[in-house]
């Protein structure tokens, strides 16, 4: 597959996610594979986000789902941002908004510099649409995206599969119909 074709494929995946459709596991597998290739020589180097933005995303990921950073959720998101400008705008703008709000509210340089209770208080404000206001709407929109993408990135990774006990499609050496439902169906049959 040529690099241009791969890029078009990844951009199509990102565009589908922006339209609100769920990410099929096969497409997520392609993204995780591409991230693994990028990580092959050591630690993942962000492709779309700045070092600060990526560190903030890692921190947010860990708050949303502990263990998601090690499972590659931030790299999954960054990779999609690298092929989709709209998604990149959501994350760079959202992280910038979050840092700015933390500065106004707590006089810190950014989200990662705040104390855990300050971070939790801020996320509690933007976690629920019932708190919608002109001031909080950008954060609510961003955090909604961040949560969904962290969940997608984590639960389509090997660690996420392991957590839920997903083994993939398994071949059966022998198949038999369970007798209890079969007997129940036969008893109800009028013939």
Language-model features: locations:
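Generic structural signal for individual residues within well-ordered alpha-helical segments
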Residues: 7-10, 120
């Amino acid at each position: 597959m040529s690099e241009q074709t791969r890029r078009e494929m990844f951009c199509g995946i990102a565009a589908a996610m922006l339209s609100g459709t769920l990410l099929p596991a096969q497409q997520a597998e392609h993204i995780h594979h591409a991230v693994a290739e990028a990580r092959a020589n050591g630690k993942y180097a962000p492709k779309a986000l700045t070092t600060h933005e990526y560190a903030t995303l890692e921190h947010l990921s860990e708050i949303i789902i502990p263990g998601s950073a090690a499972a590659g959720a931030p790299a999954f998101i960054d990779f999609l941002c690298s092929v989709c400008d709209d998604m990149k705008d959501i994350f760079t703008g959202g992280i910038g908004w979050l840092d700015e709000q933390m500065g106004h509210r707590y006089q810190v340089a950014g989200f990662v510099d705040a104390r855990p209770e300050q971070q939790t208080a801020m996320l509690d404000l933007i976690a629920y649409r019932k708190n919608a206001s002109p001031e909080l709407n950008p954060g609510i929109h961003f955090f909604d995206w961040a949560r969904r993408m962290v969940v997608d990135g984590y639960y389509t990774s090997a660690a996420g599969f392991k957590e839920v006990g997903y083994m993939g499609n398994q071949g059966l050496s022998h198949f038999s119909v369970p007798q209890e439902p079969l007997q129940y169906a036969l008893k109800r049959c009028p013939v």
